[in-house]
Amino acid sequence: MSITAERKSALIKEYATVEGDTGSPEVQVAILTERINNLTEHFKDHKKDNHSRRGLLTMVSSRRSLLDYLKKKDEGRYSKLITSLGIRR
C-alpha cells in the first residue's frame, strides 16, 4: 500500500529540478500522486475503509495546494507536470 524506497527514489530522480532536490513542488506532487494512486487501488477492495479515505482526502488537498502554488509561480512547469503525471485539471 505504501511506496517502496526504490520507487520513491526513482520519482525524486525523475522530477527533481537539481541534484539532491527532494522538496520542490514537482517532487512533492509526484510522490503524493503515487500515494493517491496506491490508495485508490486499495479502495477497490476495501470500500468501507473510512479511516484511510480521510487520509486520501488530506493527500488530495495537499496536492491541490502544491499545484496551485506551482501554477501561481511558474505556469510552464505546472502544465508540464500535470501532463507528465496524467492529472486532469
Curated annotation (Swiss-Prot):
GO CC annotations on file: cytosolic small ribosomal subunit
The keyword Ribonucleoprotein is annotated on this UniProt entry: yes
GO BP terms, alphabetized: translation
Keywords: Ribonucleoprotein, Ribosomal protein, RNA-binding, rRNA-binding
Annotated Pfam families: Ribosomal_S15
Source superkingdom: Bacteria
Cross-referenced InterPro entries: Ribosomal_uS15 (IPR000589), Ribosomal_uS15_bac-type (IPR005290), uS15_NS1_RNA-bd_sf (IPR009068)
GO molecular function: rRNA binding; structural constituent of ribosome
Assembly notes: Part of the 30S ribosomal subunit. Forms a bridge to the 50S subunit in the 70S ribosome, contacting the 23S rRNA.
Role this protein plays: One of the primary rRNA binding proteins, it binds directly to 16S rRNA where it helps nucleate assembly of the platform of the 30S subunit by binding and bridging several RNA helices of the 16S rRNA.
NCBIfam families named among the record's database cross-references: S15_bact (TIGR00952)
Family: Belongs to the universal ribosomal protein uS15 family.
Name of protein: Small ribosomal subunit protein uS15
Gene (UniProt): rpsO
